[in-house]
Amino acid sequence: MTCSGPAARAAGHDGPVHPSGELAAQIVSVLGERGQTLATAESLTGGLLGAAITAIPGASAVYRGGVIAYATELKARLLGVPGDLLARHGPIHPGVAAAMAMGARDRLGATWGLATTGVAGPDPADGFPPGTVHIAASAGSPATRSLALAGARDRIRRDTVDQALRLLLDRLREDAS
């Protein structure tokens, strides 16, 4: 895929790029125009979501930071995910993604929180097959999406980043209406 146009140029791209670069550039632009900020909470993506945002020039004006809570207990300790939610459903649940997004937003002092949790593979985890993913975006009440992604571990992680960025961009557009 070749990305061109103002968002791609702002991202420093002049050739083939992954869709996340274009999406991240749009998000940084919209957040900047509105004077809003973003924080991320990641599990299976392990920092890829934050990396996609910080790859964009100007991200420092809108990106507060992120928490990589790969271990289940860190989701509770660092992000405030309720222990009873984790005990009842485990870490791979849309409610956990929602709590992670709200926790990142609140604990890092951002307007928006964006979160990823799921199974990258290659093996199942907690009874869920690889590609079972939950994402959430929150500026108030969280919006969640549950995904069933296919492919190898790296592809699932990259596709999760793309889908999370799409969710946030959709929410930003809805928020503007």
Q: Where are the language model's segments positioned?
A:
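Short alpha-helical segments enriched in small residues
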Residues: 2-177
